[in-house]
Structure formats: C-alpha cells, structure tokens
Amino acid sequence: VLVASADGAGTKLKLAFATGRHDSVGHCLVNHCVNDILVQGARPLFFLDYLAVGEMDEDVVQEVVRGVAVGCKENDCALLGGETAQMRDFYAPGEYDLAGFVVGIVDRSLIIDGSRIESGDLLVGLDSSGLHTNGYTLARRIVFDVMGLSVDDELPGTGRSVGEELLSVHGSYLPVFKRLF
C-alpha cells in the first residue's frame, strides 16, 4: 500500500532567514515527512520538494536543495525532483517557502492504524532530538520576546547560539523503525 504525506518547513524558515543558514531546513523537512509516514508503518520510497522564492538566489537554493538531498540519502529515499517557483511580487526579498511530499510503502497486513492494539502490548518510547519542524512560532516568541535573546546569543545551557540550536536538524526515526519492524 502506498502512503503519502505533505508538509511544510513552517516558521523555522524565519530562523534560516535571520541567520543566513539554509541547509538544515531542507534536511528537517525530509525527516518530518518521513516521520509522518513511519507512524503508519511505511518506509519512504521517494520525495519531491517545492521551493517558492521571491528573487532567485542560487546560493540559497543550492543550500536548501543540498539539505533536502542529504535528508533523502539518510532516509533511503529517492529525490525525484520538485518545483522551484520564482514569484517576485509575492515573497519579501530574502524569503521563501519550502514544502515536501513523500511517498512510502507498507504491506497491507503491517499498516499501523491502532486497530490491533491489545492489553499487554509493549509501548516503545523514543528520545526526542528536540524541537522538530512544528512549534517554532512559540519557540521564537519565548526565545526572542520573553528571553530577549538574538540568533547570535548563546542559548543558556547549550553552549551554542540560538540560531545553531534552533536550526539543528531534528532526527528521523527511520533507523529505530528499521530495528523494530
């Protein structure tokens, strides 16, 4: 059975704009989409991206797509292609939007849908690698508005700048999934 998911990089992109670092958002997007299909038991087959920009900055586009390519390689899925749309009158200078689409496969008998949960089943908990692709609007409000930090300030307790920490690539659960199933 084919399983598909589509998602966007969300407001994590605001941090990429503020820091000038664009590689991790593509990688995170792939991990996010792959994690979305893993919950149904599917393994990724292929990925497509959609990058919409105001003005085309080749260096930024290459950095974003390089991150997508690394994410696809690490998740054993082919990057089939995608779309890069230039819309000069739609996006502010230096800003863009990024979305991705993943298709995976799972044997019908192995689809995870909750229907086979029984008393006595083992529940597996996994460590989180931190914020994933969701929650960045709240995180930015806390870090910038409440704590009064900038992207270059050290995030207390991390030894890293706010930008480095919040743009860290979040994990894909595919390696753990492969060991379990």
Give residue ranges: language-model regions.
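Helix-biased detector of long, well-ordered alpha-helical tracts
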Residues: 1-181
